[in-house]
Design a protein with these regions (language model features):
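N-terminal Rossmann-fold NAD(P) dinucleotide-binding loop
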Residues: 18
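Catalytic core of tubulin tyrosine ligase-like
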Residues: 23
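Adenosine-phosphate binding glycine-rich loop
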Residues: 3, 118, 123-226
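Glycine-rich Rossmann-fold phosphate-binding loop(s) that bind the pyrophosphate
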Residues: 13-14
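Flexible, glycine/charged-enriched surface loops at secondary-structure junctions
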Residues: 6-7, 31-43, 194-205
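Rossmann-like adenosine-cofactor binding region
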Residues: 43, 47-153
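Single conserved hydrophobic/aromatic residue that forms the stacking wall/gate
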Residues: 1-5, 9
């Protein structure tokens, strides 16, 4: 029985990386189902579900979900992916994550995910939303295994979780990536560099005068650790 061969999550909106993951799954003939069916029904063929933000976070006081409120006050929310991950064989992370937002799961929870064998962390934030991503990997050596109890890298298969965490994975489709990226630069970036910035250039600027801007200051600890 395969209740969930692929379990795809996304952060906010319908991101390009997330759409790419779903496109790949479509060509493997893995059927997409609703999050509700993923939890409530059993299947004798591989399935996957895609979770919207409202599906995988909940307000700490169980208030009605509002995306704008979550974006502005992410610390008031917690993850509710526990039930999904308990039923998943594979989890693919393809969302944007802000450090103020809740992690997808905690280290203490992972021993409850007895079916979970593989995590494909396309998001690839080391020690970020997916705690099993203890390091980034390369195309040449894309995966590693961690022990579910110790959270340390291991060569043993018993009680191990395979993790793929290639930090530049979306760039590994040269033609598609180059075309999309080029069109985006020409149409969505250059006009606002040469003209009046509507905020997108400032929001995308990571450093200025050799310093991280406040929005990206969380990267300093990662850089300093290298």
């Amino acid at each position: 029985e395969s209740r969930g061969l692929g379990d795809v999550y996304k952060r906010q909106g319908d991101g390009r990386v997330n759409r790419g993951v779903q496109e790949v799954l479509k060509y493997t003939n893995i059927k997409k189902i609703t999050p509700e069916d993923f939890l409530d029904k059993k299947f004798d063929y591989p399935v996957f579900c895609n979770l919207d933000t409202k599906d995988y976070v909940i307000h700490n006081e169980n208030k009605k979900f509002e995306l704008e409120h979550f974006i502005n006050y992410p610390r008031e929310y917690q993850s509710k992916t526990f039930e999904y991950l308990k039923e998943s064989d594979i989890y693919i992370s393809a969302h944007y994550w802000d450090p103020s937002s809740p992690k997808i799961f905690t280290k203490n929870q992972i021993t409850n995910f007895t079916k979970l064998k593989i995590i494909g962390d396309v998001t690839c934030d080391v020690d970020g939303s997916v705690p099993s991503t203890i390091k980034s990997t390369t195309i040449e050596h894309p995966n590693f295994c961690i022990n579910k109890d110790t959270f340390k890298e291991t060569s043993e298969i018993e009680n191990a979780l395979a993790v793929m965490a290639v930090d530049n994975l979306p760039s590994e489709l040269p033609r598609d990536s180059s075309r999309e990226f080029g069109n985006g630069i020409v149409n969505e970036v250059i006009p606002f560099i040469l003209g009046i910035d509507d905020g997108r250039i400032l929001n995308a600027t990571i450093t200025e005068d050799g310093r991280f801007l406040d929005k990206y200051s969380y990267l300093k600890d990662y850089i300093d650790s290298k």
